[in-house]
Amino acid sequence: MMPEDEVTFRLAQLLLLLDAVAGQDAKGASLERIGYYDFLSANPFLVVDSDGREGNMLRLAGFDPQVLSYASSSQRFTSRRERIQHDLGLLVAYGCCEVHNRNGAFAYSINDRGRELGARFTATYAASFTTAASIVVRRLRKLSDKALREQTARWLRPDGEGGPGAALLSVLGPEPQAPDMPWEG
């Protein structure tokens, strides 16, 4: 069983994400945008160059750019996104976040109770995820919804630059080349 299969884990992760969103936009974010932020914060090397300053920060926080789970990113993105609405509904019901009408769409934001609860998380992963979420939200918040969808689709393509296929190739190496020997019959 994966941690993201546990409701408690997902709710805690969403609280940390909503807190990172509040640091960039106090009005919150849409369901769709939260879905992108959530997935990409858990897989930050799809967004961040592993050789840059932010890549170093992520490595220090415990993320590894060569983790093989990046190879199945698109499948995990789809299943995680389907759970987000349910999980946000639970956070609203528990009084940890609020939903508002923002330009005709729902926007979710953390409230004081959710912030207080999130501040009590002591797991190393909570600190790591908070670092990743802050970086990802800061990088992506200025993209329009359409640009965010398009960019994420490029990151999730197996053959995309810096995508899961590139991460897998960096671990496995290039495909074997045929020797320069003529076949004898």
What does each model-identified segment do?
Residues 123-185:
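Exposed, interaction-prone assembly regions rather than primary DNA-binding/catalytic cores
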Residues 98-134:
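Accessory beta->alpha helical hairpin/"wing" motif in late/C-terminal subdomains of nucleic-acid enzymes
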Residues 1-72:
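Short, amphipathic alpha-helical interface elements at domain boundaries
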